[in-house]
Amino acid sequence: MSNGGGIACDIENAIRMNADCMAVQTFIGAPGESRSLELLARTADAGTRYGIPTLGVVAVGKQMERTEKFFQLATRVLAENGANIVKSYYCEGFERVAAACPVPIVIAGGKKLPELEALEMAYRAINEGAHGVDMGRNIFQSDSPEGMAAAIGKVVHEGYTAKQAYEVYEEIKNSK
């Protein structure tokens, strides 16, 4: 597993910790690209030997454009360098990004959004080809993290619309 600067946790430690997946942050089109792709390939090779999948994470710097073209290229490069799953960002044209990615793709939650907006983004992403979402602050900074986690689960696993999921969120939030 990589923190972008090097391997933070090698395969032996991942096995010892009973990891379900390893993650490597990559920097496509930015300083550190070659090194991060080398780390991804090495981590994916080790993971393949031991049956642990590797998540390739598309890092986006503040100066980089979050365009469909960039994400199509970046996600494909990660898959071609061994990622079994790719984590990227939702963008206009995401359906084409997901279609061009030869491995399952999940979206990052990004910056904190109002709950309904985060659910709408998750709903659109799933309907446009994402296999899941990897949200942090949109859950743990919510007024009801439990409600938001449940609502996201409904969108991803049960096909709820954003509005239906928001009702789940509100119900759990108001029951506390």
Predicted regions span which residues?
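A short, acidic, flexible beta-alpha connecting loop/helix-capping segment that sits on the rim
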Residues: R137-Q141, E170-E171
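Histidine/acidic-residue-rich catalytic or RNA/ligand-binding cores of hydrolases
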Residues: E117-L119, D143-I152
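Substrate-binding cleft of secreted/luminal carbohydrate-active enzymes
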Residues: A130, F140-P145
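Alpha/beta enzyme core
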Residues: S2-I107, K112-M135, K154, Y160-V168
